[in-house]
Amino acid sequence: MQLTSFTDYGLRALIYMASLPGGKMTSISEVTEVYGVSRNHMVKIINQLSRAGLVMAVRGKNGGIRLGKPAETIRIGDVVRELEPLTLVNCSHEFCHITPACRLKQVLQQAVQNFLQELDQYTLADMVKENPPLYKLLLVE
């Protein structure tokens, strides 16, 4: 299973925010500069993460973005569930005439559940704690 760029960049943005010391605020512009992605694309991602409570966005002169809750409580599986369309195949009568007898959909759904259960074992904090090479790459001190 390959994650969409939307989910990939969402995870990257969260990793960047989790890497900042003491819940420091950052900006969408800073995140897009670090990863070299489109600002418009990142705005959509941050908006969805904000609606999900994973990012807190503060408007105004001293505004910015930061994690909406502690990194220790943000499970990677939950982020993927929030950002990723998890339907692997389109099983409807109009697209496939074997849908009533097909068992593939159940197998694929179970595979997705197993994938998410594995991701649920890790938090955002697990991705960033005691990771000096990451801090160096992100230019976070």
Curated annotation (Swiss-Prot):
Question: Coiled coil located at which positions?
Answer: none
Textual note on the cofactor: Binds 1 [2Fe-2S] cluster per subunit.
**DNA-binding region of this protein:** 28-51
PROSITE patterns associated with the record: HTH_RRF2_1, HTH_RRF2_2
Q: Which cofactor does it need?
A: [2Fe-2S] cluster
Q: Which InterPro entries match?
A: TR_Rrf2-type_CS, Tscrpt_reg_Rrf2, Tscrpt_rep_HTH_NsrR, WH-like_DNA-bd_sf, WH_DNA-bd_sf
Highest taxon of the source?
Bacteria
The HTH rrf2-type domain, residue ranges: 2-129
One GO biological process from the UniProt record?
negative regulation of DNA-templated transcription
According to the UniProt record, one GO cellular component term is: cytosol
Recorded GO MF terms: 2 iron, 2 sulfur cluster binding; DNA-binding transcription factor activity; double-stranded DNA binding; iron ion binding
Q: Pfam families, alphabetically?
A: Rrf2
Which keywords belong to this entry? Answer: 2Fe-2S, DNA-binding, Iron, Iron-sulfur, Metal-binding, Repressor, Transcription, Transcription regulation
Residues annotated for [2Fe-2S] cluster binding in this entry: C91, C96, C102
Per its UniProt record, what PANTHER family does this chain match?
A: HTH-TYPE TRANSCRIPTIONAL REPRESSOR NSRR, WINGED HELIX-TURN-HELIX TRANSCRIPTIONAL REGULATOR, RRF2 FAMILY
Function of the protein: Nitric oxide-sensitive repressor of genes involved in protecting the cell against nitrosative stress. May require iron for activity.
Q: Which named protein is this? A: HTH-type transcriptional repressor NsrR
Q: From which organism does this entry originate?
A: Pectobacterium carotovorum subsp. carotovorum (strain PC1)
Gene name per UniProt: nsrR
